């Protein structure tokens, strides 16, 4: 897992065009009132910079949660992990992204049936939650890198 710090050469003040009109994912509709505003992507996905970090995903254990190899996850350490949260966990000092299930028996659940759940004792020191995934960034178009 690749750790990417939030602080970078970017100031976080850059904005990109944002068209506030909702776009249908079903049948197309006439373009009505496409108003352009500006959106600061950093302020949208990073609400608490001091407790936020980015990770790049590798592997396919979370594909049914639409988290794919190469995606970037935005993780907030200050968010309280709850039943059903997608979390970053350390198991015996190895990191993974999984869904946290607390009932009926605590486990880290992969979102791919090819992988088994990872059951654990909540009082165990071998499992530590390192944060809750708040956003994921997926690249859709092929772009030259």
Which role does the model predict for each range below?
Residues 79-80, 114:
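Short beta->alpha connector loops
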């Amino acid at each position: 897992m690749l750790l990417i710090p939030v602080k970078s050469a970017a100031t976080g003040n850059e904005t990109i065009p944002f068209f506030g009109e909702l776009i249908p994912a079903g049948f197309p509709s006439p373009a009505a009132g496409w108003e352009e505003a500006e959106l600061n992507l950093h302020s949208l996905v990073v609400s608490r910079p001091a407790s936020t970090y980015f990770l790049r995903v590798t592997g396919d254990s979370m594909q049914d949660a639409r988290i794919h190899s190469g995606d970037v996850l935005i993780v907030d350490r200050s968010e309280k992990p709850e039943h059903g949260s997608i979390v970053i966990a350390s198991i015996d000092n190895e990191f993974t992204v999984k869904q946290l299930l607390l009932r009926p028996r605590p486990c880290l659940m992969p979102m791919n049936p090819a992988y088994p759940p990872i059951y654990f004792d909540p009082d165990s020191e071998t499992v530590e939650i390192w944060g809750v995934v708040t956003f994921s960034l997926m690249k859709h178009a092929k772009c030259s890198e």
